[in-house]
């Protein structure tokens, strides 16, 4: 008997949702950084064994939106509640429950689907603090289970996976066993470039960046995958920061991104990056759609 099911990973920004998904999948399919709102699109991670398939849906961190892009991200996250049988509500062990958590809890109560509370980053707290955190969240709503984990170190992750597989119902294998995500390579390439911008820049720059892969094809002469990508920003000052003195920052972004892209593709890569200004793109629906943030996603 084959079992399958869809599981959403929900929570505030920076609680470790993407770190968890990458750990489960055994490779990077969702980019990570210490900046809030790193994940902007829903990303499927397809976990398949001989007897079961769990389709995880990593979602953007739920926050109070200030732009049309923010609206898109929050609606995209909540839309998964219509697509799944179980929700992993992830919270950090080293932070107290806040208004953002309470807002999510109200939506989860209304959704009326099983919710597992996943308390991440247990490596950062004393066990007594963890018990207080569990009691506090349990006072707010009824959870199917509570599972403390460290996504970074992998502590207790197998326990969570076993809990999910034990509760799967008989179903189809929705995706081939060798498919690990629903997104095409172009999307993953653009995300890997954006991740390097997030790591290397500060303040408003990371939130103002989108990456569009203009072309991606193999050059038969050099046997390399030739990629042309444009980094979009909202202001000339941001363009200057990303290019850097004599192009040094852009070169660094390209070099770091190329390494990750080569690992993913298993091929040598020639990466060309450009920077363009598109004023206030985060508040323009047409620009959002052009850059891959399309309302059709929810």
Curated annotation (Swiss-Prot):
Residues 58-61 are annotated as: G3. Residues 201-279 form the KH type-2 domain. Residues 149-151 are annotated as: G5. Residues 37-41 are annotated as: G2. It comes from the Bacteria. Residues 3-170 form the Era-type G domain. The keyword GTP-binding applies. Residues 11-18 are annotated as: G1. Keywords: Cell membrane, Cytoplasm, GTP-binding, Membrane, Nucleotide-binding, Ribosome biogenesis, RNA-binding, rRNA-binding. InterPro entries: G_ERA_dom, GTP-bd, GTPase_Era-like, KH_dom-like_a/b, KH_dom_type_2, KH_sf_prok-type, P-loop_NTPase, Small_GTP-bd. GTP binds at residues 11-18, 58-62, 120-123. Coiled coil: none annotated. Its main location: cytoplasm. Transmembrane segments: none annotated. It is found in: Cytoplasm; Cell membrane. CDD domains: Era, KH-II_Era. GO terms for cellular component: cytosol; plasma membrane. Residues 120-123 are annotated as: G4. An essential GTPase that binds both GDP and GTP, with rapid nucleotide exchange. Plays a role in 16S rRNA processing and 30S ribosomal subunit biogenesis and possibly also in cell cycle regulation and energy metabolism. HAMAP family: GTPase_Era (MF_00367). Belongs to the TRAFAC class TrmE-Era-EngA-EngB-Septin-like GTPase superfamily. Era GTPase family. Monomer. PANTHER family: GTPASE ERA, GTPASE ERA, MITOCHONDRIAL. This is GTPase Era.
